[in-house]
From Swiss-Prot:
Binding site for Zn(2+) 1: H52, H54, H108, D125
GO MF annotation list: hydroxyacylglutathione hydrolase activity; metal ion binding
Subunit architecture: Monomer.
Binding residues for Zn(2+) 2: D56, H57, D125, H163
Pathway note: Secondary metabolite metabolism; methylglyoxal degradation; (R)-lactate from methylglyoxal: step 2/2
Enzyme Commission identifier(s): 3.1.2.6
The protein's required cofactors: Zn(2+)
Keywords: Hydrolase, Metal-binding, Zinc
Alphabetized NCBIfam families for the sequence: GSH_gloB
Protein name as catalogued: Hydroxyacylglutathione hydrolase
HAMAP family named in the record: Glyoxalase_2
Length: 233
């Protein structure tokens, strides 16, 4: 089971569950929608994974701890003072038979993490469909390296970003002139999905390699130029 629960204006709380196991939750911008879903489905949360320390990803962390006081919360050191119970930076977590690869994907924030679970990539604000996160650190090299790391994963990887930014990202991607036919085709598909209030996510790494200009750059200089252009778009 893979469910994107809408939160705030354009966030998703991702919920992942393998049969007969507990639920893994990624990021917690608000509590109500998640708790209602967990209760309605009679589920047990095995862990909360935090990608980074922005308020739209940890805003309900304190409430989460009140609702689920025994659930371990894993996240980067930048979230240590926000209520994360287990600070991590890389490596592998084993939680209730889940093997979770922790990937350092800094750039949006310095210690941003992504999580790979059973071929599902929960990448927070590093990689979006047809886009990538803003480089608030100013460290474009770090962000470029993070995106190259994610790009190196298998094509069949299911990509689960934290925001519904796809329409705007595709509009920008069209202006870059990169693989315009694939971008236009995906734009029409996403317009229909969003018109019916359906999420455009998840996506796949194979598709992102076709439509995401930030995965098509040939080097750091081109990435910096493209990211700054998107900032002004």
């Amino acid at each position: 089971m893979l469910i994107p629960i809408p939160a705030l204006n354009d966030n998703y709380i991702w919920v992942y569950k393998r049969e007969n196991l507990s639920v893994i939750v990624i990021d917690i911008p608000e509590i109500a929608a998640l708790s209602q879903f967990i209760q309605a489905q009679n589920l047990v949360i095995g862990a909360l994974l935090i990608t980074h320390n922005h308020r739209d990803h940890i805003g309900a962390l304190a409430e989460f701890k009140q609702f689920y006081p025994h659930v371990h919360i894993y996240g980067p050191a930048e979230c240590a003072d926000q209520g994360v119970t287990q600070v991590i930076d890389a490596g592998r977590l084993i939680i209730d038979e889940y093997h979770i690869d922790v990937l350092p994907t800094g750039g949006h924030t310095a210690q941003h993490l992504s999580f790979l679970v059973d071929g599902h990539l929960f990448c927070g604000d590093t990689l979006f469909s047809a886009g990538c996160g803003r480089v608030f650190t100013g460290d474009y090299s770090q962000m470029f390296t993070s995106l190259q790391l994610l790009k190196s994963l298998p094509d069949e990887t299911i990509v689960c970003p934290a925001h519904e930014y796809t329409l705007g990202n595709l509009a920008f991607a069209l202006t870059t002139g990169k693989n315009k036919s694939a971008v236009q085709k995906q734009l029409e598909k996403v317009k229909k999905l969003r018109a019916e209030n359906n999420p455009s996510l998840p996506t796949t790494l194979a598709l992102e390699k076709q439509i995401n200009p930030f995965l098509q750059v040939e080097g750091l200089e081109e990435f910096i130029e493209l990211r700054k252009a998107k900032d002004m778009f």
